[in-house]
């Protein structure tokens, strides 16, 4: 999994931390890296996630934009439109924390760290911090594909057009 060069660089980084912090807590990690005990690499690198490809990041931005710029403003302007307001997909539910973790983490980064998508952010509590607890990827893909192909990603959609996308 790690080349000898990568192991050497990481081991040296931990040796520097050991000196700076004047602690022996890094000795085990240094030994794992120097000896090449691959079975324990996940303990060292477990908090480093796989990359989210640009296309997947754009997909997440698209679905959040749909809710933030299309659905939420419509709901604010039309508070008596109960069909849309009560529609099961009238708000962004998030992604499944078990099977769609990288998407959920990216949403949290965008909303919590970058402070983007303010209309969507208000649903954090309602959605268990954007953990839908069930797969949403296919549903969102259908919605984004319809929004792109049929409506050219317009922001000023009519009621029927919004419902069409929510029902995708």
Swiss-Prot record:
NCBIfam families for this protein: PRK05445.1 (NF003936)
Record-given protein name: UPF0304 protein MJECS11
Pfam families, A to Z: YfbU
InterPro entries given in the database record: UPF0304_YfbU, YfbU_alpha-helical_sf, YfbU_helix-hairpin_sf
Keyword annotations from UniProtKB, A to Z: Plasmid
The keyword Transcription appears for this protein: no
Top-level taxon of origin: Archaea
Family to which the UniProt record says this protein belongs: Belongs to the UPF0304 family.
TM spans (from-to): none
Keyword Lyase recorded: no
């Amino acid at each position: 999994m790690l080349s000898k060069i990568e192991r050497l660089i990481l081991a040296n980084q931990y040796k520097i931390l050991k000196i700076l912090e004047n602690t022996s807590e890094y000795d085990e990690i240094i030994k794992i890296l120097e000896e090449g005990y691959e079975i324990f690499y996940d303990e060292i690198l477990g908090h480093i996630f796989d990359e989210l490809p640009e296309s997947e990041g754009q997909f997440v931005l698209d679905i959040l934009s749909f809710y933030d710029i299309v659905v939420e403003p419509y709901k604010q302007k039309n508070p008596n439109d109960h069909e849309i307001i009560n529609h099961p997909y009238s708000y962004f539910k998030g992604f499944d924390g078990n099977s769609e973790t990288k998407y959920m983490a990216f949403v949290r980064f965008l909303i919590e760290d970058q402070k983007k998508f303010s209309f969507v952010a208000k649903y954090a509590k309602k959605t268990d911090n954007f953990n839908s607890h069930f797969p949403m990827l296919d549903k969102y893909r259908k919605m984004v594909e319809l929004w792109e192909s049929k409506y050219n990603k317009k922001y000023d959609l009519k009621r029927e057009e919004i419902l069409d996308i929510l029902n995708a």
